[in-house]
A protein has these predicted regions:
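Helix-to-loop junction immediately C-terminal to a conserved catalytic motif
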Residues: 50
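ABC ATPase NBD coupling module
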Residues: 66-78, 102, 220
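Q-loop/switch helix immediately C-terminal to the Walker
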Residues: 89-102
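Conserved ABC ATPase "signature" region
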Residues: 109-126
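Conserved ABC ATPase "signature" C-loop
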Residues: 209-210
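ABC ATPase "signature
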Residues: 214-215, 223
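Glycine/charge-rich catalytic "coupling/switch" loops of P-loop NTPases
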Residues: 252-294, 320-363
Length: 363
């Protein structure tokens, strides 16, 4: 299998640079996810590696070979999306047979791999169906079987699972990425959800065409270098803060930090799961007013507005008594927060929750 290297890679559209000075190495037989906010440059980077776009500067290296001038069809890789690149009139069987026939196997081995793929991806009842008659999830299952049969050295997957039903996505992702790991394929993906980060060896965070952070997904989640890195790895609340000495002041209370990471204004990047209801007898850190609440994924998700128009999203255990309009006492561990310096405008008072006029002024 092959490793992939990018050296000072840049690409510009007419409106400006989409990627700037990207230098990365993707080790062979590993899975790296390119993540970031919308228009971060992940899909553009995959297209540059695939050969669908030509770099404005820098090099793409596959193994030991610089491939900038090598046609996309001649590069030893496979680039895929959720849309399978075969005629809609083809049957599922035709797609799979065409894939396995690209391999240098004898007839018996080809037939065995074909049968294993059909069974693994539950495609038996679909073999005679034409591709254009399949549901989105069925078509993606065919795509995954096809990729397994092609056995690419390098796989570039751009939102491969975005059309899969949410109820089937986790199961298919687990089966597919384990298959790629066993086969030794070097996978570079732009995932369609943060759930897919569970199957990666590393994530690379892109923002406005620049690499802003890379590392193991758990490390980036816990210590994001920016809002972009925090958002790319999970839900996040951005809470304005002011650091004075060793004290951090915010709309959810104040806490001590030693040593302080900066002085003056900034933000705290806070995960919704960092908040918990106090146990009986425990003090709370602040009171949260629930404006909207819903139940999903085995927990409550509540939204509310704090002083100065700061919106807060919290995740609460399923046994919590959560409903619209309820005031809830919450606790947090500030050691879990990520503090970043930032110039901020003063918070604007909100009415009527935060500013109550004197009684005489209301008459």
């Amino acid at each position: 299998m092959l490793d992939v290297a990018l050296r000072n890679l840049a690409f510009a559209y007419d409106r400006g640079f989409a990627l700037r000075d990207v230098t990365l190495t993707f080790a062979r037989s590993t899975h790296t996810a390119l993540i970031g906010p919308p228009a971060c440059g992940a899909s553009t980077l995959l297209r540059l590696i695939a050969g669908a776009l030509k770099p404005s500067a820098g090099d793409v290296i596959l193994g030991q070979r610089r491939v900038n001038d090598v046609k996309a069809s001649a590069r030893p890789l496979l680039a895929v999306t959720a849309a399978i690149d075969v005629p809609g009139r083809w049957s599922v069987q035709h797609v799979l047979v065409a894939a396995v026939h690209t391999r240098t196997l004898d007839r018996e081995d080809r037939h065995r791999e074909y049968e294993l793929a059909v069974d693994k991806w539950s495609l038996g009842p679909l073999l005679d169906r034409k591709m254009r008659t399949l549901s989105d999830t069925e078509a993606v299952r065919v795509q995954l079987a096809r990729i397994e049969l092609l056995r690419p050295a390098v796989l570039l997957a751009d939102r491969l699972l975005e059309r899969v039903s949410p109820s089937a996505r986790t199961q298919l992702a687990d089966a597919f990425y384990r298959t790629m790991r066993v086969s030794g394929t070097t996978v570079i993906s732009a995932p369609c959800s943060t759930d897919e980060l569970a199957y990666t060896d590393r994530v690379v965070v892109l923002h406005e065409g620049n690499v802003v952070q890379s590392g193991v997904a758990a490390e980036v989640f816990a210590r994001p270098a920016s809002d972009a890195a925090a958002i790319a790895t999970g839900d996040v609340d951005v809470i304005p803060v002011v650091v004075r000495g060793n004290t951090v002041e915010s709309v959810i209370g104040a806490w001590e930090v030693d040593p302080p990471p900066f002085q003056g204004s900034g933000v705290a990047l806070v995960r919704p799961s960092d908040f918990t209801p106090p146990a009986p007898g425990e003090d709370s850190d602040f009171v949260f007013g629930v404006e909207e609440a819903g139940f999903a994924g085995g927990r409550w998700i509540a939204h509310g507005m704090l002083t100065g128009g700061v919106r807060l999203r919290v995740e609460l255990p399923r046994e919590a008594n959560v409903h619209k309009g309820r005031l809830m006492a919450l606790r947090y561990d500030p050691a879990r927060f990520r503090l970043l310096p930032r110039e901020l405008a003063p918070l604007q008072p909100t009415v009527p929750t935060d500013v109550v006029p004197p009684l005489g002024e209301t008459r």
